[in-house]
């Protein structure tokens, strides 16, 4: 559903080494466009580390470019990434929040630094392998960001900070396809990375243990872990290493002798429920459905709207408070466009609403934008 293009345009594709961007480049070539590829290097440290895949990703991207008969350029955006994305990532973790760097990376690197570089190369548009769609609405004159047609792969959540100029210059060729079809095409045309696994995790961390990585950049102070009755049940290694809803790695499994706090039986797993920075205390509760893990109201800041701004009292809205979550009906209770803040409520309780993560709003299949969760109520 991308805007209809003239017969031939110069399109610069962000070729990551993965199958989605590779098939995107092939589809554009099939449509008769002049396609040029750029491989973005966004993280410079540890190139020789067992956890870093950047070198192999570039080799895969170069192999794809060779098969497709297109030029590829290796561009280093590591300095921009550290200044615009990683520095904010560390600030948020230091403040006890859990940021989503992929959202900021898209807005600041892939659709700003990369877009600017592509335009200097004479590009008419850029393209990436994201599962999303762009549509021009003639009634409003606005470009709209739509969910990808594959509900299991939709990445509009991570793209909600894009603006009108960025959307007008961007194509998402695989957004109209299910992932299974993308894999089929890759195998059929003989792409060398057709069977490559999808990347997971935060791009600059790779496959390394998260705690090990974060420990290199943030100071930390151990402190008590308490349950919902205020009883000490363990010790944490530093609040920055934990996020709300976390189950693994808390270090208090098997404490059945502590009894059964509200919402969970004595054999149920423990979850991180609260972080108190003032007292350096981590709170954990037993049971997925514990009241402390349920919220129906939240406040958010740093709001970014793609086009139409949702209004208090507007019906038909839904939201996600984390990626891969099903849309949940919501209401905007208050919104300050100048301050870029909003407060929201949900008819149904939301699980482990986490400060620092994004709340993204939708009207049907249209992504309206979103904001960074500042705080959420927790049922007593």
UniProtKB/Swiss-Prot annotation:
A GO MF term:
tRNA binding
The terms describing its cellular component in GO are:
cytoplasm
Q: Which UniProt keywords apply?
A: ATP-binding, Cytoplasm, Disulfide bond, Nucleotide-binding, RNA-binding, Transferase, tRNA processing, tRNA-binding
Q: Where does ATP bind?
A: 14-21, 40, 129
Q: Which SUPFAM superfamilies is this protein grouped with?
A: Adenine nucleotide alpha hydrolases-like
Q: Where is this region: Interaction with tRNA?
A: 153-155, 322-323
Q: Mind listing the GO biological process terms from this record?
A: tRNA wobble position uridine thiolation
Q: Which domain of life is it from?
A: Bacteria
* Task of the protein: Catalyzes the 2-thiolation of uridine at the wobble position (U34) of tRNA, leading to the formation of s(2)U34.
**Protein family:** Belongs to the MnmA/TRMU family.
Name by which UniProt lists this protein: tRNA-specific 2-thiouridylase MnmA
Primary gene name = mnmA
